């Protein structure tokens, strides 16, 4: 299928909300949390693999929103389960939604001031 002359990818996209779990220390900033370096390295690896397309904290920072490209929801869950923060119950999957990404200005090099 194509939209606007662009061919859509066969692999689906997912909007994934991650939320703080009971292991999260609310008195500490994100980069001061236990195992920050291990978590950051893990997430950087997912970016390098092309699994995480975009991501970061939203609103007050109690949740993060990620755009992920995966074969299905099971793959999203399985890969995120390997995050050191998941095993420490610091970060949990709040919601996973399939996302039909039709608009994408990133490839046009449109930078905002």
Spans of model-derived segments:
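Conserved, structured core segments of small domains
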Residues: 2-113
């Amino acid at each position: 299928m194509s939209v606007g002359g662009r061919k859509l990818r066969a692999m689906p996209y997912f909007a994934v909300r991650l939320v703080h779990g009971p292991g999260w220390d609310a008195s500490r900033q994100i980069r001061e949390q236990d195992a920050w370096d291990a978590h950051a390295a893990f997430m950087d690896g997912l970016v390098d693999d092309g699994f995480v397309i975009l991501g970061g904290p939203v609103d007050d920072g109690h949740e993060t929103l990620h755009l992920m490209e995966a074969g299905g929801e099971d793959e999203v869950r399985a890969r995120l389960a390997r995050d050191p923060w998941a095993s420490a119950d610091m970060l949990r999957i709040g919601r996973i939604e399939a996302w039909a990404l039709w608009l994408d200005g990133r490839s046009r090099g449109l930078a905002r001031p």
